[in-house]
Amino acid sequence: MGAVSSGLVPDGRHFVSRARDEASSWRDVYKTPITTADLASRMGGYLQAYTLYSSVRPFGITAIIGGWDSEEELPVDGQVGSGPSIGSGGKVEGKKYGGPGLYMIEPSGLYWGYYGAATGKGRQVAKAELEKLDLAAGNLSLLEGVKEAARIIYVAHDDNKDKDFELEMTWISNLEGPTKGRHQEVPKDILEEAEKYAKKALEGEDDEEEAKDDDKPAEGDRMEE
């Protein structure tokens, strides 16, 4: 499971530290890893608490939490086969659970689940590009996702006319994938390939825009017509 934030850096570090404590506490009590949804719920409540009192200020971040939850039915009392059918109390035997999870948590503590999310500078451009991918269909492979994520980041930076930047990426696969369900940095060779793809795609978009501009009639031509 991984987390990223935009906004005040110290607040982001505290958010990650608290998330680690919540995950550790969950494992101590329930003897199983915390799910992405439960961690988002707990962290949303934690951020919301800082909006209730005048003695503390709200968090100055928007955070994204992503993870891959086990799809196996763990034989833990209160987790499988018994307990309520909804909420944190348990699962229903035979029903499928787990898989990928992605949540964005706002400073108010409000959080939502997404197929793809973006925050920070350039988020509107990134969101527009994410919508083009039809992530809900679930047809994007892990390697394709890395390439598209790199492309979107390059597009967002180019739109804002940002200076040169260093791209860092992490990923999470299922238990059969390259990360075995763990949150890890994308290997250097795959990251370099993704950056080449992103730069090539960006150059292609620039060429298309230049071609469209060349096809447009000049103002003088329009007046003569």
Predicted regions and their residues:
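Long, low-complexity N-terminal extensions
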Residues: 1-225
